[in-house]
């Protein structure tokens, strides 16, 4: 393996680790039986704390400004975030996967959107 390939693999692993950490900060997914609008929230406060504890900012050169505690994603953006964090990164082994699955079951357009997103992404 060349040095360039090793660096590329290391970066992929770092991104995967960060996304795995982000998946632990999902603290809310709306449910289709209650609302027609998909929404998910990530708890930034706990995410920032995880990053600080693991000293992630040292190798990524990130500065954290704790102005907002929660990131809110809605509709298509929420679907993309949840798909990456729950399905791809955690391979569907996430406590909130059943709620995510309810959205896919209830809304056929979401499933088609994810198939297209996957084709474009990979």
Swiss-Prot record:
Family indicated by similarity: Belongs to the IIV-6 115R family.
Organism from which the protein derives: Invertebrate iridescent virus 6
InterPro entries: DUF5844
Pfam families: DUF5844
Protein name: Uncharacterized protein 115R
Lineage top rank: taxon: Viruses
